[in-house]
Protein backbone atom coordinates (compact mmCIF):
# COMPACT_ATOMS: atom_id res chain seq x y z
CA UNK A 1 0.00 0.00 0.00
CA UNK A 2 2.85 2.41 0.81
CA UNK A 3 4.46 1.64 -2.55
CA UNK A 4 1.24 2.42 -4.39
CA UNK A 5 0.85 5.71 -2.52
CA UNK A 6 4.46 6.69 -3.25
CA UNK A 7 3.98 5.84 -6.93
CA UNK A 8 0.87 8.03 -7.11
CA UNK A 9 2.68 10.95 -5.48
CA UNK A 10 5.61 10.68 -7.92
CA UNK A 11 3.29 10.50 -10.94
CA UNK A 12 1.34 13.52 -9.67
CA UNK A 13 4.50 15.60 -9.21
CA UNK A 14 5.81 14.69 -12.66
CA UNK A 15 2.49 15.43 -14.36
CA UNK A 16 1.75 18.71 -12.57
CA UNK A 17 5.25 20.13 -13.06
CA UNK A 18 4.26 22.93 -10.64
CA UNK A 19 4.40 25.58 -13.39
CA UNK A 20 8.16 25.57 -13.92
CA UNK A 21 7.87 25.27 -17.70
CA UNK A 22 5.99 27.17 -20.35
CA UNK A 23 5.08 26.75 -24.00
CA UNK A 24 6.88 28.99 -26.50
CA UNK A 25 6.65 29.31 -30.27
CA UNK A 26 9.91 28.29 -31.94
CA UNK A 27 9.48 28.80 -35.69
CA UNK A 28 11.05 31.21 -38.18
CA UNK A 29 8.80 33.86 -39.76
CA UNK A 30 8.12 31.90 -42.98
CA UNK A 31 7.36 28.58 -41.25
CA UNK A 32 4.07 27.25 -39.85
CA UNK A 33 3.68 27.75 -36.08
CA UNK A 34 5.38 25.15 -33.88
CA UNK A 35 5.86 25.10 -30.12
CA UNK A 36 8.32 23.75 -27.58
CA UNK A 37 8.47 23.51 -23.80
CA UNK A 38 10.86 26.03 -22.23
CA UNK A 39 12.09 27.09 -18.81
CA UNK A 40 9.89 29.60 -17.02
CA UNK A 41 10.35 33.18 -18.25
CA UNK A 42 12.37 32.23 -21.29
CA UNK A 43 10.43 32.88 -24.53
CA UNK A 44 11.74 35.38 -27.09
CA UNK A 45 10.85 36.95 -30.42
CA UNK A 46 13.76 38.41 -32.40
CA UNK A 47 13.14 40.67 -35.42
CA UNK A 48 15.57 42.11 -37.97
CA UNK A 49 15.71 43.09 -41.65
CA UNK A 50 18.06 41.95 -44.39
CA UNK A 51 17.96 41.50 -48.19
CA UNK A 52 15.07 39.01 -47.77
CA UNK A 53 12.92 41.52 -45.85
CA UNK A 54 11.83 41.35 -42.22
CA UNK A 55 12.92 38.15 -40.46
CA UNK A 56 11.29 36.92 -37.26
CA UNK A 57 12.81 34.19 -35.10
CA UNK A 58 11.13 32.72 -32.03
CA UNK A 59 12.38 30.36 -29.33
CA UNK A 60 13.49 29.71 -25.76
CA UNK A 61 15.85 31.81 -23.62
CA UNK A 62 16.51 35.50 -24.08
CA UNK A 63 19.64 35.87 -26.23
CA UNK A 64 21.94 38.87 -26.48
CA UNK A 65 21.52 40.56 -29.85
CA UNK A 66 23.56 42.77 -32.15
CA UNK A 67 22.62 46.42 -32.77
CA UNK A 68 19.72 46.68 -35.21
CA UNK A 69 18.06 43.50 -33.96
CA UNK A 70 14.88 43.93 -31.94
CA UNK A 71 14.41 41.41 -29.11
CA UNK A 72 11.28 40.87 -27.06
CA UNK A 73 11.38 38.47 -24.09
CA UNK A 74 8.29 37.33 -22.24
CA UNK A 75 7.05 34.96 -19.56
CA UNK A 76 3.65 33.46 -20.36
CA UNK A 77 2.54 30.58 -22.59
CA UNK A 78 2.79 31.38 -26.32
CA UNK A 79 3.59 35.03 -25.56
CA UNK A 80 6.13 35.27 -28.41
CA UNK A 81 3.55 34.73 -31.18
UniProtKB/Swiss-Prot annotation:
SUPFAM superfamilies membership: Snake toxin-like
Signal peptide interval: 1-21
Superkingdom to which the source organism belongs: Eukaryota
Any one GO CC term of the record: extracellular region
Localization per Swiss-Prot or TrEMBL: Secreted
Keyword vocabulary terms for this entry: Acetylcholine receptor inhibiting toxin, Disulfide bond, Neurotoxin, Postsynaptic neurotoxin, Secreted, Signal, Toxin
Paired cysteines (S-S): 24-43, 38-60, 62-73, 74-79
InterPro entries: Snake_3FTx (IPR003571), Snake_toxin-like_sf (IPR045860), Snake_toxin_con_site (IPR018354), Toxin_cobra-type (IPR054131)
Tissue-specificity statement: Expressed by the venom gland.
GO molecular function: acetylcholine receptor inhibitor activity; toxin activity
Pfam families assigned to the protein according to its UniProt record, in alphabetical order: Toxin_cobra-type (PF21947)
Family per similarity comment: Belongs to the three-finger toxin family. Short-chain subfamily. Type I alpha-neurotoxin sub-subfamily.
Function per UniProt: Binds to muscle nicotinic acetylcholine receptor (nAChR) and inhibit acetylcholine from binding to the receptor, thereby impairing neuromuscular transmission.
Name this protein carries in UniProt: Three-finger toxin MALT0051C
Organism (species): Micrurus altirostris
